[in-house]
């Protein structure tokens, strides 16, 4: 749960800073969970990302874990939906399949809406 996630986050943050690390150099994993069998936990993951973002901490993780075990034609849809929601909650980066065209288009489009990238008609080609 998020109390446990944030407890570990606080411990790691404090230990890193004790050793001279800048919080900006630390990356926290919200632990993306498999939807199959853990559907009720998905919003907690997004809330954890928001908590990291509110603390101005970086977040990253294995995004495609959410769709593990699903049919191949469904995985890109689920991964794209989750990355959009995670980015809007402040996800800094993610471990993703760069060959998944739908996912990459979603990430690039979210970057436009978040004003991380200047829109151009050719933005999908970059």
Enumerate the predicted regions with their spans.
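Catalytic alpha/beta core domains of metabolic enzymes, predominantly
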Residues: 1-121, 126
């Amino acid at each position: 749960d998020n109390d446990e996630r944030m407890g570990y986050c606080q411990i790691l943050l404090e230990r890193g800073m004790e050793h001279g690390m800048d919080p900006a150099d630390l990356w926290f994993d919200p632990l993306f969970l498999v939807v199959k069998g853990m559907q009720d936990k998905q919003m907690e993951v997004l809330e954890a990302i928001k908590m990291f973002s509110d603390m101005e901490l970086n977040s990253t993780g294995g995004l495609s874990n959410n769709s593990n075990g699903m049919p191949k034609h469904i995985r890109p849809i689920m991964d794209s939906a989750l990355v959009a929601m995670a980015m809007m909650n402040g996800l800094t980066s993610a471990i993703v399949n760069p060959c998944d065209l739908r996912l990459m288009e979603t990430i690039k489009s979210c970057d436009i809406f978040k004003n991380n990238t200047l829109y151009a008609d050719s933005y999908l080609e970059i």
